[in-house]
Amino acid sequence: KKITINLAPADLPKEGGRYDLPIAVALLAASEQLTASNLEAYELVGELALTGALRGVPGAISSATEAIRAGRNIIVATENAAEVGLISKEGCFIADHLQTVCAFLEGKHALERPLAQDMASPTATADLRDVIGQEQGKRGLEITAAGGHNLLLIGPPGTGKTMLASRLSGILPPLSNEEALESAAILSLVNADTVQKRWQQRPFRSPHHSASLTAMVGGGAIPAPGEISLAHNGILFLDELPEFERRTLDALREPIESGQIHLSRTRAKITYPARFQLIAAMNP
């Protein structure tokens, strides 16, 4: 039997296995193998194995945030439990198999919610007290942190420019819950495994001076966030500033002014947040 599946709207690009679970549930409902009257109240996100087991997908925290904002419940894979649990709101459910999801939708089984113990706590950051001397440099960091300014450190090699820059996050105000969710949502798109470890930590990104323009601002057929977006609500540290390509540095002008980056590619146009403090270091 041939089955045609239509994913609308057709002009939006669709990639990855995140649609496996909703497609499977839709097929079961359309063929009357699943009797559930409240499917419209749920968002379903997850990749299916051949056995019907649910697998985690990137960006689950973004999906959960938007679903809750729209007043709907969301069901994700157990692998995404720690990530979604950071939202700490009602309306999130986790499951490990398609059969479990179907039983829940039919009212025959209860699904677990992400546990509070999945919530991570901030870890200690580098302490400015570790820096001996450099009174002018430390004073500059304090002014930078207080005013949200950008900073250029100039000095000979070995004078502690990198050490000073890495300690700025330790004197910045803690992330609010909204800021922490924004940063976690961006990070989950590229490295979901570290979301819980870095929860409520100010991002600190230090790309090498050989980093390409795409690595810095983001890109790809369906644009992924780059270093400037991964530094959102945190710090972007550019060591050896003159060694970066001219066009890479020019690309930072718009994000510094607007706090976001617009990426236009053939298959998608995406805007990522990119509100960061720029700390640069160079030799005289």
Predicted regions and their residues:
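Peripheral, non-AAA+ core regions of ATP-driven protein-machinery
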Residues: 1-152, 156-163, 264
